[in-house]
């Protein structure tokens, strides 16, 4: 479409400036400060730098250490906020929110989320905040390139396999929405944003996200017309109250 931002031939949607050669030693030193008994873990990087997890870097690690006379080996996933010089998807990264949401969902439901282990919020260790969680075996639709682009296991899977993932996704969403007293349980997600209704907050968040993104990719007349239309046709009856 004319005047739309052009995206050329792209075969990678993420770039990481992370130095994978120094990462194991840095993570090992930090882990020694959070593991009990003064453990001195050995850390190796398995995969993940610049491969998937578009909104944050997702790095697969294996840590080995001695604890109470036992040898422990744990496969972990590090979720790391991107550096400013890389390709941040969001203007701010609240990994503490992600950590707490995953923890609560794991405690309150049977949704298959990984166990979250430790979080570093200052950015002093890796340059940006990160947290570690247990590695979970499975297959995940890729986001580099997005699975909707084709040429991946999900796009090429038979219809029954795609349906299996779709049904599991809907079941997980239904379970999440059945968490009792969710408004209070997850109130930390809306701190400082209580003046508007949920619908207004969501619209304003999407609009602010767009305003952040246009600095890097240019404006979209289609999206801007959509924002204008929504504001002119605001569903007053729904917007005036919180969802049931």
Can you annotate each of these PLM segments?
Residues 1-8, 180, 197-198:
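Short, compositionally biased low-complexity segments
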Residues 2-45:
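Juxta-kinase regulatory segment immediately upstream of eukaryotic protein kinase catalytic domains
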Residues 46-225, 234-241:
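ATP-binding pocket architecture of kinase catalytic cores
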